[in-house]
């Protein structure tokens, strides 16, 4: 029973960290990366789909993405979607290939992104701590119902605390890496 609760809590903590990783990927660092366009959706035969599902998205160089829609009719739709998105880039279209130069980030914009990254990291830490709290409550209920001893309760709480510390440490490392990449010019 303890192992089931621990495994569930550990899985949920890991998912929280993975979610943070995907959120960090959406924060632009000034370098070209295909995941920048993940949030951009286009209307494709009546359904909203990510740009990556209607076009090839590649990195041409450190500051340029290329987008090549698979259908000629999608060029203007994709271009409009990219321009109206809030990622702050403007595609340059030549034929059916769009080049998207990544403007260098201003100091102010970098600080905004760092603030956003810190906020995301803090929300993830809170989620991890809430998972720990829930697991500890489950352990205490088992102890109250005499399904586990006081020693087993203490061991379970130590085990969940150790997992919490590991996941929070991962979040801190990811945040430090993201801050470093945002401050690179």
UniProtKB/Swiss-Prot annotation:
It is found in: Cytoplasm. InterPro entries: Ribosome_recyc_fac, Ribosome_recyc_fac_dom, RRF_sf. Signal peptide: none annotated. One of its GO terms (cellular component) is cytosol. GO terms for molecular function: ribosomal large subunit binding. One of its GO terms (biological process) is cytoplasmic translational termination. CDD domains: RRF (cd00520). Coiled coil: none annotated. Keywords: Cytoplasm, Protein biosynthesis. It comes from the Bacteria. Pfam families: RRF. The keyword Coiled coil does not apply. Belongs to the RRF family. Responsible for the release of ribosomes from messenger RNA at the termination of protein biosynthesis. May increase the efficiency of translation by recycling ribosomes from one round of translation to another. PANTHER family: MITOCHONDRIAL RIBOSOME RECYCLING FACTOR PSEUDO 1, RIBOSOME RECYCLING FACTOR. This is Ribosome-recycling factor. It comes from Hydrogenovibrio crunogenus (strain DSM 25203 / XCL-2). The gene is frr.
